[in-house]
């Protein structure tokens, strides 16, 4: 049983098949498919319409590979359940991104998949995706947001009223770092966030 979770499609459930085919992997709808129903699609040869033999030859998280062979016309094909993005199965990245961006607990989400017997990524895969891909994506979007904000302020030549807030434990506690946030009080938007050592708060 497979699941493909789309964190960007809560309000886009009205795509036709043709429309969905032209979308990027993260924009496409994903569906819950039972293994028995999936294998029914590989019972007939697409070349000569004879009965074929098919089996799941590889599983990587939520992605699987199926080999279909026809003894009548010797046709063989390999089918993948999802596209690859940067050498990684798109569904696996979507699951990790959905967990992180929704603020969910990865241990609980992945445990739910196991209880449902849904093919899914491991916790170590989620951590790797988070470290090497998702954090970088967040930083990229954040920097673009900051550039757009500064450009807009310059274009309209408006004055800006800024307010700051810092959070950190008091000396003697375990926290080594704290955060400083800067807010545009007129627009109600965060302008900047900086991670600083706790000792800087008291110097």
Regions found by a protein language model. Name each.
Residues 1-23, 36-43, 47-51, 61-90, ...:
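RNase H-like nuclease fold core
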């Amino acid at each position: 049983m497979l699941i493909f979770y789309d964190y960007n499609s809560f309000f886009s459930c009205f795509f036709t098949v043709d429309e969905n085919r032209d979308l990027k992997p993260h924009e496409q709808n994903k569906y819950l498919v039972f293994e028995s129903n999936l294998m029914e699609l590989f019972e007939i040869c697409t070349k000569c319409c004879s009965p074929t033999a098919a089996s799941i030859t590889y599983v990587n998280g939520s992605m699987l590979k199926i080999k279909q062979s026809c003894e009548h016309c010797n046709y063989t094909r390999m089918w993948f359940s999802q596209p690859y993005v940067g050498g990684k199965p798109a569904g696996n990245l979507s699951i990790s991104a959905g967990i992180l961006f929704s603020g969910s607990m990865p241990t609980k989400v992945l445990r739910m998949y196991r209880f449902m017997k849904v093919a899914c990524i491991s916790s170590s895969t989620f951590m790797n995706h988070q470290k090497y891909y998702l954090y970088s994506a967040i930083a990229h979007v954040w920097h673009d947001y900051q550039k757009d904000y500064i450009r807009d302020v310059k274009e309209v030549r408006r004055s800006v009223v800024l307010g700051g807030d810092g959070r950190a434990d008091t000396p003697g506690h375990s926290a080594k770092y704290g955060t400083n946030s800067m807010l545009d009080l007129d627009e109600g938007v965060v302008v900047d966030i900086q991670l600083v050592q706790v000792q800087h708060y008291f110097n």
